[in-house]
Amino acid sequence: MMKCLFLLCLCLLPILVFSSTFTSQNPINLPSESPVPKPVLDTNGKELNPNSSYRIISIGRGALGGDVYLGKSPNSDAPCPDGVFRYNSDVGPSGTPVRFIPLSTNIFEDQLLNIQFNIPTVKLCVSYRNWKVGNLNAHLWTMLLETGGTIGQADSSYFKIVKSSKFGYNLLYCPITRHFLCPFCRDDNFCAKVGVDIQNGKRRLALVSENPLDVLFQEV
């Protein structure tokens, strides 16, 4: 019996030595998995649907709240409403419904998409439903959000939805061409935060360096 145990130990010894040597000196490097995309959720905890409409609701209360809506830009000669605004209070009117149009089939966090006001309109104003970022406003020294964008093919019309560091979500503007003029696009992904600036007494969505707008999405 003792002889059998001795022989068994001799047989196992090379395996144990090889295993220890391989583990300590030559670890197995398994390929790292790509992070699973996280779906963006609405106020009911449902995943956003590209075929549904949503109101963009500011999380703040009182003067810090207010839905996002389509309105006429001050001093604009556009034939249709062409500005992206936020109402001055959370007890104000309901916002204008929007539709999120992803480059893929689903709406995930931190992925490129277009935003479109989803409302009936005349043929002349069809393109004035699509969000974009305008040129640098010399008076306000910022870039204002406006409409007149192009779905799926314009640097000025690409956005992302990311988790807020506080609560809810933030909107980012992310042109895919690095040479595109965007002095506010300073993070590693060449994106800029969307916040609020005051234009002629109205709260206008604009690119900001700090204090991004925290929002939720309510299905219409």
UniProtKB/Swiss-Prot annotation:
Record's keyword annotation contains Glycoprotein: yes
Propeptide residue range(s): 24-32
Pfam families linked to this entry: Kunitz_legume
UniProt site (Reactive bond for chymotrypsin): M143, L144
Keywords: Aspartic protease inhibitor, Disulfide bond, Glycoprotein, Protease inhibitor, Serine protease inhibitor, Signal, Vacuole
Glycosylation site list: N51
Subcellular location: Vacuole
InterPro entries: Kunitz_inhibitor_STI-like_sf, Prot_inh_Kunz-lg
Gene3D superfamilies: 2.80.10.50
Entry keyword annotation includes Iron-sulfur: no
Tissue expression pattern: Tubers.
Domain of life assignment: Eukaryota
GO cellular component labels: vacuole
Signal peptide coordinates: 1-23
GO terms, molecular function: aspartic-type endopeptidase inhibitor activity; serine-type endopeptidase inhibitor activity
Site feature: Reactive bond for trypsin: R99, F100
CDD domains (UniProt xref): beta-trefoil_STI_CPI-like
Disulfide bond annotation, renumbered to this chain: C80-C125, C174-C185
Motif residue range(s): Vacuolar targeting signal: 26-31
Inducers of expression: By jasmonate.
Job of this protein: Inhibits tightly cathepsin D (aspartic protease) and weakly trypsin (serine protease). May protect the plant by inhibiting proteases of invading organisms.
Family per record: Belongs to the protease inhibitor I3 (leguminous Kunitz-type inhibitor) family.
Protein name per Swiss-Prot or TrEMBL: Aspartic protease inhibitor 4
